[in-house]
Amino acid sequence: MEKLLLVTPPFVQVNCPYPATAYLSGYLRRRGFDVAQADLSVELIGTVFSRDFLERVFDLRIPGEDENLERIQAMRTRYTATIDAVVDFLRGRDPGLAQLICTGEFLPQAGRFEAIGDLSDLFGTLGTAECAKFLCTLYLQDLSDLIRATVTEHFEIVRYGERLAMAIGSFAEIETVLVEPMNPIEERMCELLERKITAERPTIVGFTIPFPGCLLAALRCAQYLKQHYPGIRIAAGGGYPSTELRTMSDRGIFRYIDYLILDDGELPLERILSDGELVRTYTRDGYHEGEGNVTHKERGCPDFTGLPFDRYLSLLETTNPMHRLWTDGRWNKMTIAHGCYWAKCAFCDTSLDYIRRYESVPAATFVDWMEEVIRQTGSRSFHFTDEAAPPKLLKEISLEILRRGLCVSWWTNVRFESRYTGDLCLLMAAAGCIAVSGGLEVASDRLLKKMNKGVDIAQATLAMRNFSYAGIMVHAYLMYGFPTQTLQESVDSLEVVRQMFRAGLIDSAFWHRYAMTVHSPSGTDPEAFGVRRRNAHVHAFANNEVAFVENRGYDIRLVGEGLDEALRHYMAGDGLDRPVHKWFAGKTPRTAVDASLIADQMIRPDASRLFDENARVVWIGPPPVRQEDGLVLHGASSARKLKFKPHETEFLLCLMQTASDLSRKFTFGEAAELFRHYSEESFVAFYLSKKWDLMRPLGLLQI
């Protein structure tokens, strides 16, 4: 019988498992196949950051003269004495070390520490444990600088050889590295792989390659297997080949692997394991399209069994509480729905299956999966990695979580659209939502319309306001350099972002420079967006980014530097009063955005306060307590006494009891009918009263 070993190669992420192998394992195990999985990414990082390996690194010669590296070398004994303790702390094994780490004298400090200034300032932003994680992360980054200089330039904590894989016209470009002798990191990587092969004895090994930064490591592992286990068949798939290698004509990669899978890997791997007809798979003989797809429901619950949960490291690369979610915390990564429910943005790879094909499952099914993953991992923290989670499904999932009394925390990606009302955001927060990330992109209504984003600044502002008021942190993905964007619009976009930070709508953000890709609407038809391709050449190996020509009239590099510098200050809470044009080098126009643009949008009424007889009313608070002159409503941290007329009290007791049954829909039309049993007054007038407003944050919601 075939046995499959699924491998996450170095380096993807170190704080929690990347979910690809877990989803594949879950599906294939339910189909009766023998499947094991391994995360070489986290296992190798633990080996690299160990006393044994660092002793070997410090024995290597530092090339040239570098004052910072020489300082690290001079503190060799401090690094080798502390490294194992630091890794144990970051794995959560020895939290008591936090106080010692924060003294400022325990860890050796080199160049990465220079930007933080006085360590005592950190305690105004972070608690002791978080401060210690932040300092340990700087410490590992200093060591990474040494490793890059002495062992291999390809090393970074969460990527390996990324620049090699970013634009490979032919496979020979990366093979020039593969024919070189292995460096010490690659040797350790293959030693870890050897242990997995010996323990599991697979007949097939599958590598997930989600990003360019793990292609080289995956190929090194495959090379090792071909040399030492030529009978093992090797498959590779994931985001990188599905995006960049779809039109591949260069067959050089098949000297290292046997199958290259595109898009979702469940069915292709099932066919390989069962010796069936290949689907969406390259072999050295050519491409096999085949037929069939696995639905999101059939894909089912991921299975994280077998992954080394005690070895993941929580890192803090920034003091910003929202920005650090990507590297801090052991999140169970899951996908609510397959694809994007919008799938129309001009910059997005909307022609690819993982975006284009939208499928979902009922909320109850998804929450069943969540409970199963909790049993597997012991963790109640989730990151839903959807391209954009659907608001309607988030509402139903939140209701199901509350109905079951499930205690979880979660964050996800969204579109900042009008359906995120104030009450929906309160519902999501009550169900454990702590943060959302979404695209504000160019922050220009003209360009948002041109890129078919489907939202405008006004909608985004209201959605962000509602998330923020509900206590949900907000991260904004930002973009510059979109075709036809002027220098004035670049300045104005920064002003919009400044006002949003000033208003407390955004907790963190990141600027991306627009890249035209072959799978996006803008890459398919550049002329429709006011630019033209530089050439129509198709590479034999990887094809993704499209070079284009535009009469821009300004230095896009300087614009990017200004935007990044401003954002760095905004996320630290300063620079918000500085005129935005002053962040840019050279002659730059002042903003043309009205100084009160965002403030004016924030005072617009929320859709949750517009009476809709078809809307659902829910009560998610504890049972109210009747008093002589009204009700006492208990929140998590306080209680509020509200005075009502006797008939209002009786109505609300009945309403809240009925609306607390989250298994059935109770509408405002039904609530109005119920009100007529207690009063001849207008229900709408009562609904629009200050009394009703006071009950909303305590759990009386319109969704």
What are these regions (language model features)?
Residues 188-195, 245-250, 363-372, 420-427, ...:
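Short, acidic/polar
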